[in-house]
Amino acid sequence: MKTCEWCGELEAVPGRNTVYWELPDGTRAIELTDTPAMVCSSCGMTYQEENTVKEIEDQLLLIQTKKLPESLTYQQLMETERILKRNYFDFS
């Protein structure tokens, strides 16, 4: 168990959920199913950890998003062929 980022209780466990993500160009949103998440049994919140958010955001910057279907799994998104090797705009 991990500490919940929302309520601070030591009740968060790994899970999966469906999320909706706006593409970087703002033209539309896609549905990502089976996305890694944390689920807190104390407050009921389900959320993505920062590293998962960064992975999704980076991948969406590195692929041709116009070819993406309206819905796909997290794994399918991460396996989509990249047109750049890495996110050159990430200075962290």
From Swiss-Prot:
InterPro entries: CHP03829_YokU, Znf_MqsA-type. This is Uncharacterized protein YokU. It comes from Bacillus subtilis (strain 168).
